[in-house]
Structure formats: structure tokens, C-alpha cells
């Protein structure tokens, strides 16, 4: 994939994530600065998601540590856990929010 395709794929996934957060009603504030999406929680904890263009990866940093996602078989998969990106973000959001989140 070239850089343009990479950015299109990541932007599409991040927009989906923002929409899911909005639809959930959870107290999570998404803040975008350049290639970084920070999810800010009421308890002041954060999840940081950024695009790593040179490696064509999405990186996620949370309470659980750092994770790298590569685009394989038309989905973003974690190199450490094998989890799909959105599923891992949902799991990490639950940990940071300290409450059950109703994902739509």
C-alpha cells in the first residue's frame, strides 16, 4: 500500500471509532492533533492513537501498554495480541473509563 492508501484506511477507521464513541454516550473526549488521536477520560487518563506512516501501522498507547497494528487481510491486527483494532480500543476504553460502555 502507498502512503495515500494508508492514510485513507486509517482515517476511515478513526472516524468509525469517533462515531462509535459518540453513539455510546460514554464520557470520552476524542482530540485530534496532527496524526494523533487522544481519547481523554473523565478520570484524566488517556489512550493515545497515532499513525506511523513510515511503517504503515497504527500505534496505541494505554494503561495496558503499547500496541502496534498492521493492515492484514483487510483489517488492522495487533502484532502482540492478534486482536482487531476496534475491539482492542473498546476493551481499553472500558479499562480507562472504569465503567461498562454500551457500544452500539
From Swiss-Prot:
Gene Ontology BP annotations: iron-sulfur cluster assembly
GO-annotated cellular components: cytosol
UniProt protein name: Iron-sulfur cluster assembly protein CyaY
Domain of life: Bacteria
Presence of keyword Iron: yes
PROSITE patterns hit by this protein: FRATAXIN_1, FRATAXIN_2
Annotated source species: Aliivibrio fischeri (strain MJ11)
Pfam families, per the entry: Frataxin_Cyay (PF01491)
Keywords, sorted A to Z: Iron, Metal-binding
One GO molecular-function entry: ferric iron binding
Similarity field: Belongs to the frataxin family.
Job description of the protein: Involved in iron-sulfur (Fe-S) cluster assembly. May act as a regulator of Fe-S biogenesis.
InterPro entries: CyaY, Frataxin/CyaY, Frataxin/CyaY_sf, Frataxin_CS
